Every structure is written in structure tokens, then in C-alpha cells.
């Protein structure tokens, strides 16, 4: 092995320099050596002959039904003890925001009672075999789903602490609290190395640099698991999960569940580095990631494989080459995302039917919902009996699951409530560890004039929306999935920053206003607590139309700071809560001191410990934190990672001031970006979709319901299964899974035989946006729709420019034509609304659906797309015209056969070169399509021609799908210098990622020159 390239050694060099300057590291973060291949695992929990013999004996006597049951993981709200017995269920989980009895205030005893009942069902003597259930939970910053638990800083803050041994202690506390509630398994740690801070899960990663992730991975596994059943305190240990395997932090533009485009060498040396120490420490489970991997070395046209179906990485690499002998669990319905286009599956998967995921190496399948997990069990059994899933693959999966259960001591442990004498959580001792973690995670970006630390007797104004908010202080994955909908009381413990300050600063005053109502020139300083509000996966992504600029993402914060300064407050100390580095130059310039506090958890005392002096006026606790993520100096300076070419951040990786080593920050550039980081200027026309609701509200927009009892509207509660209604119940909205099966990512509206509307509106109702470029670009309003109950009254669609400025069309017929129970993409041309009066320069309501009577409609992924044809005409007459193909139909024979159904042939290419296409070339009196490929670089898929269906038509080919196909004739006149064969595929242009055959590379090959060759595409 040789040292890693300079871009990775730079981080270690920066750390070494800081250490010399006086920052004493708890344990050094060592540089990594470059790897050339996937290393073998030397697990701290090796195979045990006695356990293997027990597994062999049990496995040999199990039925297929029992085995598939062991491979099934279901949600606690979607299963009963009787079903555990009947279906031999091997595992349950509680999703974010799911509690015993769906009671957020559930006590430890409530959790234990449920754990006991589920465990007892699995161990019932009437079962053919008594195989203990294993319960998993997302304990990602402490036991964060449980009221009263200790919640630690999220991983982004822990990365700044640079304290590997502290990580082990944090994991030990987490394990004790998880075990105290009767749960056996923590879905942690997250080992993502985050490369684009727009990702909504950035805060779940310790660093952009794999060195920190590698230093932490093994320590956390040691703290959670210990030696499991062989540990000195086995009942205080839980099974750990290394997740999400692999590349989740590297997706293009930071898109959650997107595509990571890197070489295998980069995957190995960047994204995998945390896994090696974690697996060596004995991690017993690995969770597959939602993302896809596209091998950059294979070229731009290479297939992007979903990790849930990536046999090479899950089986060939992780299990075979590395020797991992625990089990791989899928993520929430991740198996259902496999298609022919993103895997080797011969068919598109569903949540309840996906042999490809199991064949690829998934051992336990997370299928949360009752109807789907029951169907999954039946379908999987059928697939084994048909030979689609080999029996040996099932046996391997179950062997791994049983092995882990034996290693964890689950076969010999008593019922969950009897395993520990003390079931306390959130103890003073545990919170002290979290308080220490907060102290060490804070990064001091600015301290001009040594404003900090503050004297305890100074007159201090504590202001900002987050000053007295445990919800904002904790962020996502806190009680609820997204961390939203929580009050301070819901946490059942913990201290806000204001709560901490008032303990030690007798002259401090809390101002909860947004305008600094209590501020005046008698205040020595203001502590202004600002930043992001809670979010988690998907909903936290910064989309293409947004930037990293804090002043635009959270304009209320800079407004408050300006108000405080205008009212004469002498010094401004800004404390930023955020799950990512942000471009905050405007806020930095207006602050005398600026602290990046990340998402510190429940123990706000840890912040006050560092901000204030002792009673004697001395430094109490110095700043320790150093940036584990580079800090941007421009609104769109992303991706930004240490070692990048032209690396020039505002504050570099490893930066962090202290009281011992201070410094002055000069005035910073405040340039804003006019367009989003993923948008290119279109000269008055948009060229990038704008999202208003995608698995949750986009920044600056709220989905609401309204009715006569409250026309001003009610914001829909999201990220849980709780419903939101208008006061008199005219319309009710409930989060449901979207078309991809992603939890609570769409909204189902139910009109209860009354007038009501579902709509998206600016968070500030009167605030408008100039979205004229989308109209100029021939755009459409697009959303996913699923009708559960067809409307009994007219349905209207509207786009408003602040009521009564509206444009409304009747879409009743189109909605009635949608298939009941199935998701359909609806697209309405924006011009329809412009024709009815919408002023697109002042939009505040980009979607409104109005009806009365009985009607149930689910809506998801609401956006405007430029250059998008509609499938609902402006008169709302119908949805896409569907043409049933039940007999042969000509597409192009001596020209386009039916111009009403088929459009003219087109071409596509990338890279150098071009394509010349003549769709009406005269070949001896007959029209043919003549194509010349000019100078295209070598490599598959660099240029293509296509024959499109004319928008807005759709074809129903189900009648001929089994036996039919597409036939065409091809004559090659000259191959030129190309050595590549022809490839062919079928693609649904509107859904290219989910509806395509994939590249068929051998069907055409290289036909002989000068003769017509017939090709049949099944």
C-alpha cells in the first residue's frame, strides 16, 4: 500500500498543524493509506463452532414458510402478536415517529410491554420453533425516538469534536438506553462520507473526509455491541448496523437516493473507509443504501445500479471478498425501487415482490406495511418454489440471521423487561456525556474583539426562533422522522440554550419576537440563535432552484439581527443551528462572534458552558471543535471538499478558533446568486424544474387544506401518519407513501361531502415569486396523483397570483378518467392557467385543487417542468389518450404512418461529434430515415436516434406484451472508424429511469454492410 493522494493527506496535515498550535486531540485522527482492493475483514466477533452447529441444526428443521418469515421485517404498527406467530416474523422495527400505541408520550414501560408481547409471540411454545424476534430502531443520535431519552449532537457535530474515544462512550450510553426499552438492535452508525452539502442527510455524516469516519466507525461499534452475548454486560449491548452501504453521501448534486457517479477506486477509498474498521470491530448487520452507483470508469452511458440490487457489491465484494458473515438488511421498501433500468431484474419490482433484491444479497427485507409484507411472504415463497430464488440463497440469508441472533444471546435472554434491573433513560450520568459532546462539537468561526466568553453578570438578550426550541436544537430524527411537530414538553427532558443561560446569567432576558421587540441599547450583548428548522432525508435536500445562502433560506434570521443592531444592542453573538455548512457571510458580517453549533441535541447547557465565563471571570470551557466540513464562501460553492482542485473555501477543513488561539475575521463578500445552484441561466426561460412538494414541503412553501370553516387554511402536518382537518372536518389530509413506497411522502386529501381545497402556498401568504420563465418555457404543472374515491362533484385546478388573482380550469373529466388505486403522472400546461388569468410574475399558490362532495385524492412530487407537454388539455376533458395496441401497427413505412400517434424521428448525442438525420430520405422512390454519425467519441451509447410517440398519447401494450415486440429494418452503408456494435432499447420518455428495457447490447450487433437486416425487439 502507498499513502493516499495529496487530497486526502491534506486533512491530516491540517490537523497536525492545529495540534502543534495547542489543540490537544483526544486521540489522533490518522491519515489513511490508499487501498487498491477491498480488504478482508478480521472481525472481533469471529465464527463460533458451537453457534454454527446450532444454526445448522435449526436451519435443517425449518420449513420454507419459517425461513421467509425470518427474512421479513415489519413495522410495529402493522403487526399483531398473533401475526408474529402465524407468519413466523423474524424482525420488527419502529419507523421514525412510530411509538407503542402510536403515542408519542409512551413511557419506557409502554415500550417494554410491547417488546414483551412481540417477543412472547415469537417464543410461543405452539410455534414449530421458538426463534426470538429482533427489534430494530433508528437510534442515530441517542435513543431519539423515545420521550425522555438522551439525545446527542448529530454526527456532523461529533465529527467536529474529533474525539474517537468519546464516540465509544456515546455509543455505550445509546446502547444502554435502547436496551432499557427492550429493543435489541440500533440502526447505527451512519458511515456516509458526504461530498455535496445540499444533501438533506448531510448532518448524518461525520465528515467530508473519510479519515474521521474511519476513526469513528470501529469505536461506535465497540460501544454499541461490545462482545454481545460474551460481553461483561451483555444486557446493556445491542446489535449495531453499518449503514448505508454504499455511496449514499456521494450522490450527484446531493440528491437523496440519487446516483453516485464515481470509480470503484473512489468508492473504495472515499465512501467505504468507515466500513472497514466498523466490520473489523464486529458489526453484525449492514443496511443497504437507497442510492445507485454508476461506475465512472465505465463511461457516461454506464448503467446506474441501485444498491438494493447490486449483487457485485453486496455479495461478491462485501460477503465473499471481504468475508462479512452477518446479515444485510434492506432500507424502508428499498427493494421495491428496483427496475429493469436500475438493476438486473427481468421485471420491475414492487414492495411486495422482488426476487432480484434477495438474489443480489439482501438477507432481511424491510417491508413495513401489513398488506405488503403479507404479499411479500407469499410472493417470495412462490419465487423459491418456481426456482426464481434459489433455495440455497434463502438458506444463506436465514443462516446469517440466526447466527446474529445467537451471537446477540437472544435465544437465551429472558423477555425484554426482565433483562435489566434498571430501565432508566435520560439519567444525569448519560446527559453529562451528551453535554460534554456538545462542548467539544462547537466551532468558533469568528470572535472579533474577544467578545466571547461573556461575563455572567452582563445584560444579555437571548433571541431568535431557536433560542428556546428543543425541536430546532435537535433537528431531524428526533421523536418524529423529520423532527417536526414537537414541542419542548414532548421531549420529556433536556435543556434549551435559553434554559441553560437563565441558570447562570441572572441579567439575561428572552425575546421570542421576530423583530427584537425587547431590544435596546442597554443590552451588552445579544445571543441570537438562528438557522435551519428540522428536516430529514429527502425533505432536507436543497434542490436545484435553491442555494446554500442562509439569508435566502431563512430570511427571518438576518432580519432579526439587523433589527437588534438597529436598536443599539452593543454586541451580536450568533449561534447557528444547522445540519450543514451554509453560506452565511451576511450574518457573519453582522455578528461580532459566530458559533457553528450544528444540531447539538437535548443538552443546551453544553453551549452555555462554552459561551460564558466562570463566576470568577475565567474561561470556563474553551472551544474545541474544528470543521469536519469545508465552509462555503459563495452561495453555490458546492461540492466543496478538502483536496479539490482550486479548493478555496471561506473557512477550510480543520478551521476553528479558540480562546487560547483567537483571530480576527475581516469583512466578507456578500454576493448572492441570482439563480439556484442547479440552474443555468435561460435568458428569460426556465430550463430546470422547480419543486414545491417532494416528499414534503419545499423551502418557502406549505401544503394546506381549507374550507368554509377556515378559508385561511390549515398547514398539513407531515412526517407522521397524523391527519390534519379543517375545523368542521370538511376536508382531511393524511401523509401516505408516495408512488415509490417512500414513507409519508405524499398527501391524501379526503373531501367529506363538503366544499374544500388542497393547495400549496407561499409560507408567507402574500409573498410572491416571479415564475414567468416557466410559462415562457412552455412549462406544465406536474404532479403524481392517485384517486382512491372518484369525485362526485366538479374538480377545479387553479394557480393563484394572490387571490382574487387566479387562473382556474375544470379538470373533472380528466380526474374521473384516472385509474382508481394507481399512481398516474398528471401534467397541465401552464398556458391553460395563463389563459384564465394567472399572472405568472406574482405566484403565491402554484397548485390548488378544489372540489365538494365525496372525493379522495393523493398527491405527490408537485413541480413545474419547463418544456413539458401536458396530458390534460386546457378544457380538462381527459387525461392522456390511451391507445390500446392489440394488433400490429405501422410506425414508419414510407414516412410516418400515423402523424396523429407518432412524431418525427429525433436524435440525441453527448460529447464531441454530431448526428445528421434526414427523416424523409428518398431511397429509390421510398422514404427511409437516413442517419450519419459524425465524429462521436468511442464508447457505448454516445449517439442515438429514436421514434417517439406523439405527446400526449400513451400506448397500452399489455395485450401484446407477452408475445409482441417492435420490428424494424436496418441497412449499414459505412461503419467508418467505429468498432462499437449497435445498441437498442425501449424507453418511456416521461419516466426514463423507471420505464425502460435497458441497453440491449447484443440484439443488433454489427450487421453486414449494404443489406437490409430485420431486427425484432421483444
PLM regions: where:
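Glycoside hydrolase catalytic-domain context in secreted enzymes
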Residues: 23-691, 700
